Each structure stands twice: as structure tokens, then as C-alpha cells.
Amino acid sequence: MEETLSSQKLTEQNGMTVTPQDSIMSLLYQARWGDGSAYLKLADCYRDGIGVKKDFFGMITMAHMAEWRGAINRIDDYIYGLPDGSDYKTLFLLMDSYRSYIQEDPDSIEQELRTRDSPEAKTLLGMITVDQGDTISGINKIKEAADQGCSLAELLITIPDWKGRPRADATKLAIIAHRVPLAYLILGDLYYEPDDNGKSNMQLAVEYYMKAEEHAVLDRHGAERVLDYYRNGGNVQLTEDDVKRLELIVQPKSVETE
């Protein structure tokens, strides 16, 4: 991950500008301390490939975190603020339209996705194909997209069985977590909650939750679990700052206004 943002690429979103003085590590640090505007800047970085690999799912993840932290009322506020003609804006709106009008004819959405030569479009097309009952063809599309570097597709193929209640494969998640940090949060949930044999591993779950916190993607549920484990004498070492950040995550959000 590059430390310094390219001075050639400046993005402006919701009245904020990503500047060369910002770095990914600096923005992550600010986000971990509850700065919703830092999440919006991180979303912009993933959108434009500034300091990080350009990534649709990374953009969506950070925009969702900005919403949860109260920087925006809803993720749509961020999406609709993107420049017209943005591929990521179009992809999000196409998928949103499919979810909203799933009972209606989805052919036009599928046709639009097929015209877009990107792994992200292929992933969304694969998801629709699975949803329509052709699991094998859909998963093959998603696997192709994963091979082409789509992080959302990489995350989706960690689910070995799409029938019934999907449960991700922990080994596959661990392999991609350094590229798809949200996998750390999913791993935490997997190990915290009892498996099919009724067993859980809270210590390992907490370790993964804290890795998610390092990448600014820990949610309230995970933070509550870490604090509960820690305060009940669990085998985890937290600094005073760790505890403060976890407590900030647990706090109810309040929408930021200027």
C-alpha cells in the first residue's frame, strides 16, 4: 500500500478534497478514531485508485463505514454525489435497480452489465445468474472475476455452498484478508459464533476483530464482543487507546453537520 497519495489525482466529494498531504495510513488512523470524513476520503481513494488499488468493493465498504459513522445519512448520498459517467456509480445503481425491481424484467440490467468489460460487472452478472437459479454458471462468472482481481468476487467465492445458510470458508478468507480487509471482520464472526459442532474460538475471533479494527472496518457488534471478552478476563492485550477506539465504535452514531 502506497504511503503517499499521488499529487496528480485530487478528488473532491461532499465538500472535501483528498490532498497529497493525506496518506492512506493517515486516513486510516483518523477513521479508526471515528472521523467519518476520513472514511469518505478513503472511499474516494478506492474509487480513483489514489494510494491504493482502484477497487469497487473497497469504495463501497468505506462509504458504508462513513454512513455508519454518521458522516452521511445513507450510502446513496455518496453514490449520487459521484461524477456522472463514473463506472462505479453506474454499477452500483444497476445493482440497486435489480434489487429494487427483482420481480420485474431484469433483462435490461443484465444487458447493460454485459456491455461493460470489467470484473466488477462480471461479478454482479454472476450474482444475478446465481439468484436466477443457475448456480454453476453464476459461480463460474464470479470465479473469472476473482481471477481478474475483483475483491468482491474474491470474497464471494469463499462461500463453498450457496444453498441454505451460506457460511464462508475460513481458510479461504484468511488467504484474501490482506487484500480484502472486511474478511477479518467475517473471520471474527465465524470464530466467535458456534460452528455446526457447537464450538467457538473467542480468542481467535477477538484477534481477527482487532485486525479488522486496524483496517478501520470493525463494526459495533465486533467491538462489543472484544470489549466484553477483555473485561471478562479474556486472553487479549489491549492498550488504553485500543479500548478508547473500541468504545468509540460502540457509541451510537450521530450525523455530522457543518
Model regions and ranges:
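Alpha-helical tetratricopeptide repeat
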Residues: 6-9, 21-24, 28, 40, ...
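Single-residue signature of alpha-solenoid repeat helices
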Residues: 23, 59, 105, 109, ...
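Hydrophobic/aromatic packing residues within the alpha-helices of TPR/SEL1-like helical repeat arrays
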Residues: 27, 63, 109, 113, ...
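Short helix-capping/linker turns of helical repeat alpha-solenoids
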Residues: 32-35, 48-50, 67-72, 83-87, ...
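Hydrophobic face of amphipathic alpha-helices that form TPR/SEL1-like repeat modules
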Residues: 41-48, 77-81, 93-97, 127-131, ...
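TPR/TPR-like (Sel1-like) alpha-helical repeat modules
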Residues: 57-70, 146-147, 203-217, 243-252
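Terminal, low-structured helical/coil segments at or just beyond the last alpha-helical repeat
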Residues: 224-258
